[in-house]
Amino acid sequence: MPRFKPYNYDQDAMVVINYRHQLQPGTFEYAVHYLIEHKLDLSVFYPRYSNEDTGRRAYDPAILLKIILFAYSKGITSSREMQWCCETNIIFKALSCDTVPHFTTLAKFVSSHSDEIEELFEQVLLVCHDQGLLGNELFAIDGCKMPSN
């Protein structure tokens, strides 16, 4: 009978991950991160927050935008799926600094800032296209409603 190396699913592992190292220059996710952190003006989002003195700390719009824009680039439009990606996908974890916004937080942010997000997404895509990071793939977000049977 052949002999195989043993394995055990009931073992724990401590893996050190530096999230900044997961965002490699020359990739779309790095471009999204860099543009949101260093180039785009996000002040348009700030007036809706009124928690300077009291109230719970809010998620930084930069973090929410990174999650949403990267998800859109992958064809993910469901806020529940975005939350799941933040829990399980290393690139989403890196973009969100290992935070996991609730799907209702993501959905509310998108619905209350849809025009601003659309404008920023277009800017990000144009810059990434100029840098050759898109690979000439089709990006489409379809809001078409279909009747169900």
What does each model-found stretch correspond to?
Residues 31-35, 70, 85, 89, ...:
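Generic, well-ordered alpha-helical scaffold segments in large soluble proteins
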Residues 58-119:
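Short, positively charged, Gly/Tyr-enriched micro-motifs
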Residues 25-69:
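Basic, short loop/linker segments at the boundary and entry of helix-turn-helix/winged-helix-like folds
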Residues 1-38:
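Charged, often Cys/His-bearing segments associated with DNA-binding zinc-finger transcription factors
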Residues 18-22, 57, 114:
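Hydrophobic alpha-helical scaffolding
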Residues 10-15, 44-47, 101:
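Short acidic (Asp/Glu) and glycine-rich catalytic loops that position anionic groups and cofactors
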Residues 96-149:
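Active-site- or DNA-interface-adjacent structural scaffold in DNA-acting proteins
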